[in-house]
From Swiss-Prot:
Protein name: Succinyl-diaminopimelate desuccinylase
Gene name of the encoded protein: dapE
Taxonomy of the source species: Bacteria, Pseudomonadati, Pseudomonadota, Alphaproteobacteria, Hyphomicrobiales
Role description: Catalyzes the hydrolysis of N-succinyl-L,L-diaminopimelic acid (SDAP), forming succinate and LL-2,6-diaminopimelate (DAP), an intermediate involved in the bacterial biosynthesis of lysine and meso-diaminopimelic acid, an essential component of bacterial cell walls.
Residues the record marks as active site: 77, 142
This protein's pathway: Amino-acid biosynthesis; L-lysine biosynthesis via DAP pathway; LL-2,6-diaminopimelate from (S)-tetrahydrodipicolinate (succinylase route): step 3/3
Length: 388
């Protein structure tokens, strides 16, 4: 194992031993900051607060004072492990067996943080900070509500005068094998609630009541009857998914007074949240007028807009580094859920590339040692090419 690979693997194992379940940091960022300071980075621990959520620790680190500026973004917080007894090893033990590292966050995304940290520290040790600037933008609030995390950290950095040319976000983008996918954008996400009012009554006397459920079903059918669009060159078609239908009625002999459905829409760059809301309101109003139903359609505030980073020389550079190390030409994709790239996009072009995501958030989350080693080599190649 090379020195670079050894450093990446040991950093990963140490990070995994810090049980940083959102909103706790458990020393993960302090450990990372100490390692980066030893390598010549200036570090800043920044805590953000909001009256409705717990305080969150964030980390910003930088080496270099000028030239091109490449920032790596990531998160040290992880989802809960669930029943630890279901795991092969302690989910916060950083254990290795059979060429695999086990632990909550191995894939999402302490492995990628460790790989980039190893590459960046080696690059700086070889005088790389004279060629440009490398920074880390690390939050502890990605798996949670994302209120005191990357969005605020970016604003904090910008107010300090930090300007980024490009960003790599270390999300586990690969589907089957390391090198098969780069995320160049993300779909937007919009949450909505449809409520239909009725008149409560006894089921034996339906003429004295008005059941809201059939009206709700008709309205939901109207919302989903026609596709929202056919997709674009870089995006799949937008999709509305009904996620719950509730009436709050535990009995068999009462017609409920109200029925409510919740839904989520993953939308492409054809739409803005306002345009999408207007389209769905028009569909609901048309169907509601025909059915004679009193309904209300409410949309939650949206901070996840659809976006795409147009392929360019930076995309080519990252793709070439991946293909050189893995022999795979990565697919450029906008699939999947939202990520903190939705915040970063407002400051600089952002690409997402990390480990294989097949075990993220699962029992026995694990990453192959060879993948972490290869990822560190890919990141090192990116740094060398970027600052050439």
């Amino acid at each position: 194992m090379s020195d670079l690979a050894h450093t990446a693997v040991e950093l990963c194992r140490e990070l995994l031993r810090r049980p940083s379940v959102t909103p706790l940091d458990a020393g993960a960022q302090d450990f990372l900051a100490a390692k980066l300071r030893e390598a010549g980075f200036a570090t800043h621990s920044v805590v953000f607060s909001d009256e409705s959520t717990p305080d969150i620790q964030n980390l910003y680190a930088r080496a270099g004072a000028g030239g091109r500026h490449l920032v790596f973004a990531g998160h040290t917080d992880v989802v809960p492990p669930g029943d630890s007894a279901s795991w092969r090893f302690d989910p916060f033990g950083g254990e290795m067996e059979g060429g695999l590292i086990f632990g909550r966050g191995a894939v999402d995304m302490k492995g990628a943080i460790a790989a980039f940290a190893a590459a960046a520290m080696a690059f700086v040790a070889e005088g790389g900070a004279q060629k440009g600037s490398i920074s880390f933008l690390i939050t502890g609030d990605e798996e949670g509500p994302a209120i005191n995390g990357t969005d605020k950290l970016l604003r904090w950095a910008h107010q300090r005068g930090e300007r980024f040319d490009h960003c790599i976000l270390g999300e586990p983008t690969n589907q089957q094998a390391l090198g098969d996918m780069i995320k160049i954008g993300r779909r937007g996400s919009l949450n909505g609630t449809l409520t239909v009012k009725g008149v409560q009554g006894h089921v034996a006397y339906p003429h004295r009541a008005k059941n809201p459920i059939p009206h709700l079903m008709r309205l939901l059918a109207a919302l989903t009857a026609e596709p929202l669009d056919q997709g674009t060159e870089l995006f799949d078609a937008s999709n509305l998914e009904i996620v719950s239908v509730d009436v709050g009625n535990p009995t068999f002999n009462v017609i409920p007074a109200e029925a409510r459905a919740r839904f989520n829409i993953r939308f492409n760059d054809i739409w803005t949240p306002d345009a999408l809301a207007a389209e769905l309101r028009a569909r609901a109003e048309k169907a509601g007028a025909a059915a004679g139903a009193a309904s209300a359609l409410h949309f939650e505030p949206c901070n996840a807009l659809a976006f795409v980073t147009q392929p360019d020389a930076f995309t080519d550079l990252v793709s070439a580094a991946i293909e050189q190390a893995t022999g795979r030409k990565p697919k450029l994709s906008t699939s999947g859920g939202t990520s903190d790239a939705r915040f970063i996009r407002a400051y600089c072009p952002v690409l997402e590339f990390g480990l294989v995501g097949s075990t993220m958030h699962a029992v026995d989350e694990r990453a192959p040692v060879e993948d972490i080693s290869a990822l560190a080599s890919i990141y090192a190649d990116i740094l060398n090419s970027y600052f050439k």
